């Protein structure tokens, strides 16, 4: 394990030997990745030139894998002689607000534009297909603007993109690029889990899209429904405005896409497993349990903990 700190004077310090506990946390939406370190006040910490300040760069690598590149945002010390550091990746700088008026842009282009405006580094930004006719956001969190654009990609093109910071570079990946060759299950690194099946949130068996016709002055509806699931669960409907510039065929296609996304029972798992640093929020992994055959799950949140020689991870995962 390698943990490096680079301060504003350009000095590079290897603090690997000082770390007693490490936690690396990632989430699919709305949060930067977090690295939490507990340092023992000894060894290199006693060096007269050693210093850690807010804003310093922190790098974490292990077994040849570059895991985290971020910046110190808080430090806590106390009488126990332990120093606790919290660092965030570049996405932390997207939590500020901004205003944008953009026409005919893709989510990929929105990310590139915001990153350029705020001096953030980008890496691989894979192609998104949906062109947002008009994006108007006033005094809104930059990350929310990006996630909204990615939501349009999912809604209109059915493509669930992963947006994250990959060791210091904002990255956008298609689902196929996020698939890991990893199976969790009994005998496959998993040692505890809880399973939930629900139709209580984000499940709809009927979609009502509407569009106001300026010529006739009437509101036109485009319904699509799964009658079998309406009988099974009752009417669970989504009522939503369609794009003003979309034609009838496009609206009907969008309604069908929304039904395919939402017309199902939600299957989610909370998993405790032996740690594997390849796993982060946004990855797809395979899970094998007695309750079902091997199935592909999306990692919604992921928390790694390293304490001495022990490495575990806690995952919230779901079928999409």
Explain the meaning of each model-derived region:
Residues 82-99, 310-320:
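Short solvent-exposed strand/turn elements
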Residues 1-2, 51-56, 155-157, 165-166, ...:
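A short, compositionally biased
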């Amino acid at each position: 394990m390698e943990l490096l700190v680079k301060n504003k004077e350009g000095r590079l310090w290897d603090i690997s030997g000082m770390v007693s506990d490490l936690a690396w946390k990632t989430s699919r939406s709305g949060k930067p990745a977090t690295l939490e370190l507990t340092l023992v006040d000894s060894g290199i910490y006693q060096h007269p030139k050693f210093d850690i300040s807010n804003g310093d760069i922190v790098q974490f690598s292990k077994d040849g894998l570059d895991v985290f590149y971020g910046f110190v945002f808080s430090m806590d010390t106390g009488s126990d002689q332990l120093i606790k550091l919290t660092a965030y990746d570049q996405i932390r700088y997207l939590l500020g607000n901004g205003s944008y008026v953009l026409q005919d842009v893709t989510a990929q282009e929105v990310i590139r534009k915001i990153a350029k405006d705020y001096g953030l580094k980008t890496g691989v930004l894979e192609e998104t297909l949906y062109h947002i006719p008009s994006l108007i956001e006033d005094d809104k969190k930059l990350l929310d603007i990006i996630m909204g654009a990615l939501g349009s990609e999912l809604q209109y093109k059915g493509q669930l993109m992963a947006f994250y910071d990959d060791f210091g570079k904002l990255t956008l990946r298609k689902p196929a690029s996020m698939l890991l060759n990893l199976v969790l299950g009994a005998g496959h690194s998993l040692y505890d889990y809880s399973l939930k099946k629900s139709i209580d949130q984000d499940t709809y068996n009927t979609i009502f899209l509407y569009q106001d016709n300026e010529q006739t002055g009437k509101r036109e509806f485009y319904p699509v429904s799964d009658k079998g699931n309406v009988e099974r669960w009752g009417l669970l409907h989504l009522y939503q405005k369609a794009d003003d510039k979309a034609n009838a065929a496009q609206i009907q296609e969008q309604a069908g896409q929304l039904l395919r996304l939402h017309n199902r029972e939600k299957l989610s798992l909370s998993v405790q497993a032996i740690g594997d640093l390849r796993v982060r929020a946004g990855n797809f992994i395979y899970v094998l349990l007695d309750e079902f055959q091997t199935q592909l799950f999306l990692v919604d949140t992921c928390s790694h903990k390293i304490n001495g020689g022990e490495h575990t991870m806690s995952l919230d995962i779901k079928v999409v």
